[in-house]
Amino acid sequence: MTPALFRRALMVAGGLLLLPAPSHAHLMNTGLGPFYDGVSHFTLTPEDLLPALALALLAGQRGSRTGRLALFALSLAWLAGGLAGLTFPANRSATALTTVSFLALGGLVAADARLRPEWVTGLALVLGILHGYLNGAAMSQAKLGALGLVGIVTALFVAVTLVAALVVALRAPWARVAVRVTGSWIAAIGLLLLGWSFRAA
Protein backbone atom coordinates (compact mmCIF):
# COMPACT_ATOMS: atom_id res chain seq x y z
CA MET A 1 0.00 0.00 0.00
CA THR A 2 1.43 3.34 -1.01
CA PRO A 3 1.58 6.22 1.49
CA ALA A 4 -0.98 8.24 -0.52
CA LEU A 5 -3.45 5.34 -0.57
CA PHE A 6 -2.89 4.76 3.14
CA ARG A 7 -3.64 8.44 3.88
CA ARG A 8 -6.85 8.27 1.85
CA ALA A 9 -7.96 5.10 3.63
CA LEU A 10 -7.18 6.74 6.98
CA MET A 11 -9.22 9.81 6.03
CA VAL A 12 -12.19 7.64 5.00
CA ALA A 13 -11.97 5.66 8.25
CA GLY A 14 -11.76 8.89 10.25
CA GLY A 15 -14.77 10.27 8.40
CA LEU A 16 -16.78 7.15 9.20
CA LEU A 17 -15.94 7.55 12.88
CA LEU A 18 -17.46 11.03 12.80
CA LEU A 19 -20.88 9.76 11.72
CA PRO A 20 -23.43 10.34 14.49
CA ALA A 21 -24.74 7.39 16.45
CA PRO A 22 -28.43 7.18 17.38
CA SER A 23 -29.21 8.83 20.70
CA HIS A 24 -31.96 8.16 23.20
CA ALA A 25 -33.13 11.25 25.03
CA HIS A 26 -34.54 9.81 28.22
CA LEU A 27 -34.25 6.09 28.77
CA MET A 28 -31.15 3.97 29.01
CA ASN A 29 -30.75 1.10 26.58
CA THR A 30 -28.52 -1.65 27.97
CA GLY A 31 -29.31 -4.24 25.34
CA LEU A 32 -30.13 -6.67 28.16
CA GLY A 33 -33.89 -6.29 27.97
CA PRO A 34 -36.56 -4.07 29.49
CA PHE A 35 -36.01 -5.10 33.13
CA TYR A 36 -32.35 -4.09 33.13
CA ASP A 37 -33.14 -1.00 31.08
CA GLY A 38 -35.45 -0.01 33.94
CA VAL A 39 -32.78 -0.75 36.56
CA SER A 40 -30.20 1.29 34.68
CA HIS A 41 -32.70 4.10 34.10
CA PHE A 42 -33.26 4.51 37.83
CA THR A 43 -29.61 4.27 38.82
CA LEU A 44 -28.41 6.65 36.08
CA THR A 45 -31.17 9.28 36.22
CA PRO A 46 -30.51 11.88 38.93
CA GLU A 47 -34.09 13.20 38.67
CA ASP A 48 -35.31 9.87 40.06
CA LEU A 49 -32.37 8.67 42.12
CA LEU A 50 -31.65 11.75 44.24
CA PRO A 51 -35.19 12.42 45.55
CA ALA A 52 -35.55 8.72 46.39
CA LEU A 53 -32.24 8.78 48.26
CA ALA A 54 -33.27 11.98 50.04
CA LEU A 55 -36.48 10.30 51.18
CA ALA A 56 -34.48 7.28 52.35
CA LEU A 57 -32.17 9.58 54.34
CA LEU A 58 -35.17 11.36 55.89
CA ALA A 59 -36.89 8.09 56.77
CA GLY A 60 -33.67 6.69 58.23
CA GLN A 61 -33.26 9.79 60.40
CA ARG A 62 -36.67 9.11 61.90
CA GLY A 63 -35.94 5.47 62.80
CA SER A 64 -36.52 1.94 61.59
CA ARG A 65 -40.35 2.00 61.75
CA THR A 66 -40.52 5.13 59.62
CA GLY A 67 -37.94 3.65 57.27
CA ARG A 68 -40.04 0.53 56.71
CA LEU A 69 -43.25 2.51 56.19
CA ALA A 70 -41.60 4.87 53.72
CA LEU A 71 -39.91 2.00 51.86
CA PHE A 72 -43.11 0.14 51.12
CA ALA A 73 -45.20 3.28 50.54
CA LEU A 74 -42.67 4.68 48.07
CA SER A 75 -42.26 1.42 46.16
CA LEU A 76 -45.98 0.71 45.88
CA ALA A 77 -46.81 4.32 44.97
CA TRP A 78 -44.06 4.35 42.34
CA LEU A 79 -45.47 1.15 40.86
CA ALA A 80 -49.06 2.48 40.91
CA GLY A 81 -48.01 5.80 39.39
CA GLY A 82 -45.97 3.96 36.78
CA LEU A 83 -48.90 1.78 35.80
CA ALA A 84 -51.04 4.91 35.47
CA GLY A 85 -48.33 6.48 33.29
CA LEU A 86 -48.18 3.37 31.12
CA THR A 87 -51.95 3.38 30.72
CA PHE A 88 -52.50 7.14 30.31
CA PRO A 89 -49.19 8.61 29.11
CA ALA A 90 -48.78 12.36 28.81
CA ASN A 91 -46.11 14.18 26.84
CA ARG A 92 -45.81 17.05 29.32
CA SER A 93 -42.61 17.70 31.21
CA ALA A 94 -42.76 18.15 34.97
CA THR A 95 -39.23 19.41 35.52
CA ALA A 96 -40.33 22.05 38.02
CA LEU A 97 -42.22 19.50 40.12
CA THR A 98 -39.38 17.01 40.17
CA THR A 99 -36.85 19.66 41.16
CA VAL A 100 -39.14 20.87 43.94
CA SER A 101 -38.97 17.33 45.31
CA PHE A 102 -35.15 17.71 45.43
CA LEU A 103 -35.49 20.99 47.31
CA ALA A 104 -38.16 19.90 49.77
CA LEU A 105 -36.73 16.51 50.70
CA GLY A 106 -33.12 17.70 50.76
CA GLY A 107 -34.14 20.63 52.96
CA LEU A 108 -36.00 18.35 55.38
CA VAL A 109 -32.96 16.07 55.65
CA ALA A 110 -30.63 19.04 56.18
CA ALA A 111 -32.91 20.43 58.89
CA ASP A 112 -33.22 16.98 60.52
CA ALA A 113 -36.96 17.65 60.59
CA ARG A 114 -38.77 15.75 63.32
CA LEU A 115 -41.66 14.54 61.19
CA ARG A 116 -44.09 11.90 62.37
CA PRO A 117 -43.99 8.56 60.52
CA GLU A 118 -47.34 9.34 58.88
CA TRP A 119 -45.96 12.55 57.35
CA VAL A 120 -42.89 10.80 55.97
CA THR A 121 -45.15 8.08 54.55
CA GLY A 122 -47.33 10.75 52.93
CA LEU A 123 -44.25 12.33 51.35
CA ALA A 124 -43.26 8.88 50.08
CA LEU A 125 -46.68 8.40 48.50
CA VAL A 126 -46.61 11.79 46.75
CA LEU A 127 -43.04 11.29 45.52
CA GLY A 128 -43.78 7.76 44.33
CA ILE A 129 -46.92 8.68 42.42
CA LEU A 130 -45.31 11.72 40.75
CA HIS A 131 -42.06 10.08 39.69
CA GLY A 132 -43.74 6.76 38.96
CA TYR A 133 -46.21 8.42 36.60
CA LEU A 134 -43.41 10.21 34.76
CA ASN A 135 -41.44 6.97 34.48
CA GLY A 136 -44.48 5.05 33.29
CA ALA A 137 -45.18 7.64 30.59
CA ALA A 138 -41.54 7.43 29.47
CA MET A 139 -41.69 3.62 29.47
CA SER A 140 -44.81 3.79 27.31
CA GLN A 141 -43.08 6.01 24.75
CA ALA A 142 -39.98 3.79 24.71
CA LYS A 143 -42.11 0.63 24.41
CA LEU A 144 -40.47 -0.97 27.47
CA GLY A 145 -43.79 -1.68 29.16
CA ALA A 146 -44.43 -3.03 32.62
CA LEU A 147 -41.20 -5.04 32.78
CA GLY A 148 -39.13 -1.86 32.54
CA LEU A 149 -41.26 -0.36 35.31
CA VAL A 150 -40.67 -3.43 37.48
CA GLY A 151 -36.93 -2.94 36.94
CA ILE A 152 -37.21 0.67 38.15
CA VAL A 153 -39.22 -0.29 41.22
CA THR A 154 -36.81 -3.13 42.06
CA ALA A 155 -33.80 -0.80 41.89
CA LEU A 156 -35.73 1.76 43.95
CA PHE A 157 -36.61 -0.80 46.61
CA VAL A 158 -33.01 -1.97 46.96
CA ALA A 159 -31.54 1.55 47.04
CA VAL A 160 -34.02 2.89 49.60
CA THR A 161 -33.63 -0.21 51.77
CA LEU A 162 -29.85 0.08 51.88
CA VAL A 163 -29.70 3.85 52.45
CA ALA A 164 -32.43 3.96 55.10
CA ALA A 165 -30.89 0.99 56.96
CA LEU A 166 -27.47 2.65 56.87
CA VAL A 167 -28.84 5.89 58.33
CA VAL A 168 -30.81 4.07 61.04
CA ALA A 169 -27.61 2.30 62.12
CA LEU A 170 -25.61 5.53 62.44
CA ARG A 171 -25.00 6.53 66.05
CA ALA A 172 -21.94 8.78 65.95
CA PRO A 173 -22.85 12.50 66.00
CA TRP A 174 -20.46 13.28 63.14
CA ALA A 175 -22.16 10.62 60.98
CA ARG A 176 -25.57 12.17 61.63
CA VAL A 177 -24.14 15.54 60.60
CA ALA A 178 -22.80 13.94 57.39
CA VAL A 179 -26.35 12.78 56.59
CA ARG A 180 -27.61 16.33 57.06
CA VAL A 181 -24.84 17.69 54.83
CA THR A 182 -25.82 15.18 52.14
CA GLY A 183 -29.38 16.46 52.38
CA SER A 184 -28.18 20.03 51.92
CA TRP A 185 -26.26 18.98 48.81
CA ILE A 186 -29.40 17.37 47.38
CA ALA A 187 -31.35 20.56 48.11
CA ALA A 188 -28.61 22.62 46.42
CA ILE A 189 -28.77 20.39 43.33
CA GLY A 190 -32.53 20.91 43.28
CA LEU A 191 -32.08 24.66 43.47
CA LEU A 192 -29.62 24.59 40.58
CA LEU A 193 -31.95 22.42 38.47
CA LEU A 194 -34.90 24.67 39.25
CA GLY A 195 -32.96 27.74 38.15
CA TRP A 196 -31.81 25.93 35.04
CA SER A 197 -35.38 24.91 34.15
CA PHE A 198 -36.56 28.54 34.41
CA ARG A 199 -33.60 29.68 32.33
CA ALA A 200 -34.51 27.20 29.58
CA ALA A 201 -38.17 28.28 29.56
Which stretches of residues belong to each language-model region?
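Membrane metalloprotein/metal-transporter helix-bundle signature
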Residues: 2-201
